[in-house]
Design a protein with these regions (language model features):
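Non-catalytic terminal segments and appended small domains
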Residues: 1-161
Length: 161
């Protein structure tokens, strides 16, 4: 699938420097391996580092804007498993959504869920961008919904005996 990428500031250098196997003049904005589901997003900070206090959030520029070349596909920004498990830094809203018609710079809100200050350094891998299909609903108002065995039970209801 075609994916156009626009780099901001010196982001092309940051991505090329952090990637492996990038040819001279290459940009490095690609999946790390042939079977990787996502593309790592990097902290394209103006300063060398940012400190995130316990429970605090920080908006981190990823230095790129994208244009997805397929209809019905959007970008989803997920936490990196190691960053969340080791440092407690996760995508603040759970998952970020990059609508296919959005053309601005991708920014990642990171939340420090740990009890200690965490440091984000320039060029660090902070999240991953995964392209996935989506469906738009054609909502139809109604007075009643169809019956199911579950009904309106929620919040752990299906696990009860």
């Amino acid at each position: 699938m075609a994916l156009k990428v626009k780099f901001f500031r010196d982001a092309a250098e940051i991505y090329a420097k952090g990637a492996t196997g990038v040819a001279e003049g290459g940009h490095g904005f690609a999946a790390a391996t042939m079977h990787a589901a996502g593309i790592d997003l990097r902290a394209c900070l103006d300063e060398p580092e940012v400190i995130v206090g316990p429970g605090d959030r920080v908006c981190t520029p990823a230095g790129v804007a994208i244009e997805i070349g397929a209809a019905g596909v959007a970008g989803f920004v997920f936490s990196r498993s190691g960053l969340g498990a080791k440092d407690g830094l996760t995508v603040a809203q759970g998952v970020g959504v990059i609508d296919p018609d959005y053309r601005g710079e991708i920014k990642v809100w990171l939340l420090n869920t740990s009890h200690w200050e965490q440091k984000i350094v320039r060029g660090q891998r902070i999240a991953q961008l995964v392209l996935l299909p989506f469906f738009q609903a054609n909502a139809a108002p109604c007075a009643e919904l169809g019956d199911t065995d579950r009904g309106a039970g929620g919040f752990g209801h299906t696990g009860k005996m």
